[in-house]
Design a protein with these regions (language model features):
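Hydrophobic alpha-helical transmembrane bundles that constitute the permease/transmembrane domains
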Residues: 33, 119-123, 143, 147-151
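Transmembrane alpha-helix interface/packing and boundary motifs in multi-pass membrane proteins
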Residues: 19-38, 113-114
């Protein structure tokens, strides 16, 4: 595949790919590290016909939707579902417990703050669901944090790429 063919494909399917990767990442599926992928997306956008603001917006929507899946599972499934999914990992449980305490102390803004901290930003949906945070708070604060994170990473790649 030539570089020209790759960019043509990215122009056609890039937004679908970006949204799919972001959605999966916020659902905590392994293999989707935003810290690596999002700056690369910015570079690709700079070299394509895609819009930076549209890409950031759609990545935020995909991130919120992916987060809502985990939030809903924990909201309605509670501790038994979390135990079933992550019961063996003491480190993971410890991170979730720390996020839980931080959100409980900081309320909604704690959720937005955690959304920009690598390694724990995607698991914050779990304690938010377990705490039964109101969905409008969850979506609002998640969108705020995800917007900051995705904008920073995609813009980094976009503005520091050689056009």
């Amino acid at each position: 595949m030539t570089a020209e063919t790759f960019f043509q494909l990215f122009n056609q399917y890039g937004l679908i790919l970006v949204c799919s990767v972001v959605f999966c990442e916020y659902m905590n599926l392994p293999g989707f590290p935003a810290g690596v992928i999002m700056p690369c997306v910015g570079v690709l956008i700079a070299r394509s016909e895609l819009s930076l603001p549209l890409t950031v917006f759609l990545s935020v929507v995909a991130g919120v939707l992916g987060s809502l899946v985990i939030y809903a599972v924990c909201y309605w499934g509670g501790e038994p579902v979390m135990e079933k999914l992550f019961g063996r990992s003491k480190k993971f449980k410890s991170l979730v417990r720390k996020c839980h305490e931080f959100i409980d102390a900081q309320h909604g803004r704690g959720l937005a703050i955690i959304r920009v901290i690598p390694c724990i930003r995607t698991i914050v949906s779990i304690p938010a669901g377990l705490l039964r945070m109101p969905v409008k708070w969850f979506v609002g604060w998640s969108a705020a944090g995800i917007t900051v994170w995705n904008t920073a990473l995609i813009s980094f790649g976009y503005f520091f790429s050689e056009k």
